[in-house]
Amino acid sequence: MTGTMLAVLDDVESGAGFIRTIAARAERLDARLIIYLLTPGPLAAPELAPFGALYLPDQVLQADSEEQLAKLRSALAGSPVPIDIRGLFDDVAWLAGDMRRARPIADLAVIGSHETWAIPYLYRRVTEMLALASGGPLVILPPGRSLAIVKHAVLAWKPSAEAVRALHDLVGLLEPGARVDIVSCGDQPTHDDGPRGHKAIADYLEYHDFEVGSVWLEQRYDVAEQLQTHALEIGADLLAAGAFAHSRLRELIFGGVTAGLIGETRLPVLLSR
């Protein structure tokens, strides 16, 4: 059950389509929607963040934040679901931490992909924070995609607590009787009922009356790209994966599936931890 949804953005104009999509999802679920609009201080150039910050008195930045909040409230006026719009303003380097300290409680957090953000650095930091510290599942939503109905999903499977969490969170988003393809990259084990196999996951999903498929892909270097390409080729509505099964530092230095999915999101992606 999704009773409360959380959405975060940093620009009303860039995120307009994202907000309309999330409001429609909240209406369909009869869910409450909490929206955080982040207003960073001025930068010499967005791509320089977190460097290149320019000084602006707090009262001026607050006025800018209030102006943007007024635009967002106007855009969502008349919505049939309760919407709680909140604002945070600060230096771009601190906003993700401010968001974490605010600790909004929601059943599902949703964030637009990098195309819907004015500052790429802020998108990455907020997305990582939500995946690691929100205490619930996170969906990254690229432009032109919807969360209204999930009838076909891909579950990226690698034996881990994070992947099991993704399995449980995914079930809560699926339509009754939906199809789930369990997808792993690497050599298929000889026995499917072993710890690396798909049988236990398939049994769980079938018990919940979902249609289940099992796929093993030959692993290539960029697993995040490989998973998304496969999901798009089979027409999946959503890709679900465990988030940061390795440490965030290791992912930042060496790369990883979570970092890849955050960096380039081609279909709705559910991240769970």
Predicted regions and their residues:
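A short acidic, glycine-rich active-site loop
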Residues: 54-67
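Gly/Ser-rich helix-loop-strand patches that form or flank binding pockets
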Residues: 19-21, 97-146, 232-273
